[in-house]
Regions:
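Active-site phosphate-binding strand-loop segment of PLP-dependent enzymes
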Residues: 147-173
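N-terminal small-domain helix-loop-helix segment of the aminotransferase-like
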Residues: 2-5, 9-100, 108
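A short helix-loop-beta submotif of the ANL/AMP-binding
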Residues: 136-141
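Conserved PLP-anchoring active-site segment centered on the Schiff-base-forming lysine
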Residues: 112-129, 133-134
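Nucleotide-sugar donor-binding loop of glycosyltransferases
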Residues: 124-126, 145, 173
Length: 173
């Protein structure tokens, strides 16, 4: 039986595990740490939200799976928010989908769109799932520098021109 997992072997170390270990070591040394690594809540959920969740959980029509794209009214509300915020028109039936979260959404997008041999342009630095999602999908990564003193658009153009075959996807944050 083959117990090798080549996609997992291609994954780089997870930056939040590394920073987590560094934080724990610093705390064990007695250092005061302010954690900016992830947006984890540091307070209780507001009571009105808890009450609404309890109310919804008691409704019999909420005891099942949602439609695969997500509830239409929620998709419509998302599109309305993009219109207000960015003046962008989106079609809730064709251009909006509800996911469990951003990590799962990006990973599933790359699984759906990318294959072995495809290349994904990823800004560097970037959020870890931008790299992990492409690797899990079997794609190759082309890093595009986003650092002070480097013209991102020139780097992006160079990456597009020099990548063969042409990139399949570009991640924007």
């Amino acid at each position: 039986m083959n117990t090798e997992f080549p996609r997992i072997k291609r994954l780089p170390p997870y930056v939040f595990n590394i920073t987590g270990e560094l934080k724990m070591a610093a705390r064990h040394r007695g250092e005061d740490i302010i954690d900016f690594s992830m947006g984890n809540p540091d307070g209780p959920t507001p009571q009105h939200i808890v009450d609404k969740m309890i109310e919804s959980a008691r409704k019999e029509n909420t005891h099942g799976y949602s439609v695969s794209k997500g509830i239409w009214r929620l998709r419509k509300a998302m599109c309305n928010w993009y219109k207000r915020r960015y003046d962008v028109d989106l079609d809730p039936d064709k251009e909006a989908i509800v996911t469990i979260g951003s990590k799962e959404g990006l990973a599933h997008l790359m699984l759906a769109c990318c294959d072995r041999g495809d290349t994904v342009l990823v800004p560097n630095p970037s959020y870890p799932i931008h790299i992990y999602g492409a690797i899990i999908a079997g794609a190759d990564i082309r890093s595009v520098k986003m650092i002070p003193g480097v013209d991102f658009l020139q780097e992006l153009e160079r990456a597009i021109v020099e990548t063969v075959p042409r990139p399949k996807m570009m991640i924007l944050g």
